[in-house]
Amino acid sequence: MSKQQQTQFINPETPGYVGFANLPNQVHRKSVKKGFEFTLMVVGESGLGKSTLINSLFLTDLYPERVIPGAAEKIERTVQIEASTVEIEERGVKLRLTVVDTPGYGDAINCRDCFKTIICYIDEQFERYLHDESGLNRRHIIDNRVHCCFYFISPFGHGLKPLDVAFMKAIHNKVNIVPVIAKADTLTLKERERLKKRILDEIEEHNIKIYHLPDAESDEDEDFKEQTRLLKASIPFSVVGSNQLIEAKGKKVRGRLYPWGVVEVENPEHNDFLKLRTMLITHMQDLQEVTQDLHYENFRSERLKRGGRKVENEDMNKDQILLEKEAELRRMQEMIARMQAQMQLQLQGGDGDSGVHGQHV
């Protein structure tokens, strides 16, 4: 056997080495070849810069034909669901990113109806995945379940509005919520910290379940542990988005130009944009796992229970019909038996009358 042929196999002369230590590399290659899927929902009132932030996060334009509605249109406007999918490739790794936007949220006078549209969409994706998972061909299931929801909070209030509380409580058992303070450049650093604390206190007060970053494993390096600690401390993330390149300190940066200076989007000293993007990228797998193991399983269990109750009710109805038919048969049999008994009595009575008359004669 030639040397080239021998190199195709695990070297038998390596003591104590079987070769399954290479399995993670196989999984990695397979995952890279298949690509990744992720669905991000963005919810918040109009004018908070949601579209700009999403374009900034992924360096792409997901809304090239978006038209901003006027004030008159907003009054009559109902919430819509707009899903945009884009294929992003970076260093050979493909990501199929779907961003679900909800234009019209919070614009109507009665905002309760907008909850139903968004909740129905989340449930529909669960229902579709359950249907595909239960089918015969399960090799190419497209996962459109909502893995994460960026909920945008206005920086102009003093915390959460009643609408914010009601909506987050309505969806927190269905999707991973990441609270985001929009337009952080309208706040001073002290105002930003006060608003963050106020929002966290209100989230705890109202028992709202937001996405909690998992603790770093003990065997992780110190840099990753410190990164995890900083990300946790930054929730809710206060962000600035911009698609404009401006010159600052002799270099081109994405940011916003003001008379008093420049706010750089990707400067961690100016806002939490980089932290938000780092959180999303480094915890994308965990967000998918929580969606699968917690939110989807809860939906699936409830759905199967409802289906089970439906089947049980159908069985009960069938049993009831059988019992009614059996009762009807018994009534008919009893009626026939009574008729036969009456006929028998009549026959016996006729014979008796003949015997009596014969004695008198």
Swiss-Prot record:
It holds the Pfam family Septin. One of its GO terms (molecular function) is molecular adaptor activity. GO terms for cellular component: cell division site; ciliary membrane; cleavage furrow; cytoplasm; kinetochore; microtubule cytoskeleton; midbody; motile cilium. Filament-forming cytoskeletal GTPase. Forms a filamentous structure with SEPTIN12, SEPTIN6, SEPTIN2 and probably SEPTIN4 at the sperm annulus which is required for the structural integrity and motility of the sperm tail during postmeiotic differentiation. Required for normal organization of the actin cytoskeleton. Plays a role in the biogenesis of polarized columnar-shaped epithelium by maintaining polyglutamylated microtubules, thus facilitating efficient vesicle transport, and by impeding MAP4 binding to tubulin. Required for the progression through mitosis. InterPro entries: G_SEPTIN_dom, P-loop_NTPase, Septin, Septin2. The modification Phosphotyrosine is found at residues 17, 211. Residues 182-185 are annotated as: G4 motif. The modification N6-acetyllysine is found at residue 190. GTP binds at residues 44-51, 78, 104, 183-191, 241, 256. Transmembrane segments: none annotated. Residues 34-306 form the Septin-type G domain. Septins polymerize into heterooligomeric protein complexes that form filaments, and associate with cellular membranes, actin filaments and microtubules. GTPase activity is required for filament formation. Filaments are assembled from asymmetrical heterotrimers, composed of SEPTIN2, SEPTIN6 and SEPTIN7 that associate head-to-head to form a hexameric unit. Interaction between SEPTIN2 and SEPTIN7 seems indirect. Interacts with SEPTIN5. Interaction with SEPTIN4 not detected. Interacts with SEPTIN9. The lineage of its organism: Eukaryota, Metazoa, Chordata, Craniata, Vertebrata. It comes from Bos taurus. This is Septin-2. Residues 101-104 are annotated as: G3 motif. SUPFAM superfamilies: P-loop containing nucleoside triphosphate hydrolases (SSF52540).
